[in-house]
Amino acid sequence: LDSITIVSPRYPPYVGGVETHVSQLAKRATKFFRKVSVITTDPLGHLPAVQEVDDYLTIFRIRSLAPRENYHFPSPSGLFKAMRQSHPQVLHLHCIHDVPGPIAGIMRGNSSMIFTPHYVGRLNSGLGRILFGAYRPFISELVEHVPRIICISRFEARLMINTFPGSAGRVEIIPNGIASDLREKNQWREPEEPTILFAGRLERYKNVDKVMRAVAKLREKNDKLRLRIVGRGPIKGELEQLSHTLGLVGSVDWYDRLPQSELFPLYASSTAVVLASEYENWGNTVAEAIGVGVPTIVANTSSLAEFVEEGLAVPVEPPIDDLKLAAKIGEVIDDPKKFSPKGMRSPLIISWDEAAEKTFAPCMSLVNS
């Protein structure tokens, strides 16, 4: 095939789940397309407007407004110019909750389309609810015209079909991949001192405060227990203050957003990874942690329940509170090897090569149709 353009609100060097997803697929798209382009935003204007990467990828970065880094409003003229320059045969749009992908869908011309919505079914800010409510009719029209809608979990697929009934029959499920090289280099071994890891955006719904309270409770009997928190977000300052209140100063290691090359060694050297959020359309950190074999504790709801169903993760039943978390974390740190998923196989744990094959191999029939 000749060309594909992937449109995403953000792209590395920014760090996050969508950024990882898009960059991993873009690297592998050259196996299927002669020309690969990414259109993304650069709110601060500090990065090159056009960047060639190793002769296989062109990145177009458009100035945008980005209130609280949650929503990205690109320059319409900049987006139109990048679309015209990339001239895609296939247009792969990302993020139903943000602006660039759906707007690029308006400008699609004769391009065949793929849509990966990263849909969570709810929004955590007033601006998000207003924005999504305003352009939902347009999104519905876009969804009606996209021949392939790729969701990353059964949970997300159900949300899409319930919200946009017209998408039924065109939704397929392709889980996010795992970096095979990092997985192989960072296989889990039980650490000498018990260490709990959370990695993700620091939002209230992630229940990191409850994880901290659970760790504080467990430290009453085991003062060697430590907590690692990786990420940034609007409640980081609040969580740092909570660490003082709970007497956890010196027992919590704080990390900013980390590249995967630095995150995987943290997985491999932790006693357990915890994601206590009750609402996730996928769990990148969960899949990665399971891939390296670390015991992984999750809220038994939303997409995270799929890992429990596969026997890969340790469940905490909702509603989540610190007492339930403390009980489950305590059970795991008493005998971590008993709960390790090391060596287990599942269709939820795939490589990025497999994810790219499933995503791009059908594009020939898409273009021909």
Regions found by a protein language model. Name each.
Residues 278:
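Aromatic "clamp/platform" in nucleotide-sugar-dependent glycosyltransferases that forms part
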Residues 112, 122-142, 180:
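Nucleotide-sugar donor phosphate/pyrophosphate-binding loop at the beta->alpha transition
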Residues 155, 177:
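Carbohydrate-associated surface elements
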Residues 257-258, 265-270:
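Short alpha-helical donor nucleotide-sugar binding micro-motif in glycosyltransferases
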Residues 5, 189-206, 212-215, 228:
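Conserved donor-binding/catalytic core segment of Leloir-type glycosyltransferases
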Residues 46, 76, 90-122:
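An aromatic- and histidine-rich active-site surface loop
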Residues 240-258:
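Nucleotide-activated donor-binding/catalytic signature segment of Leloir-type glycosyltransferases, i.e.
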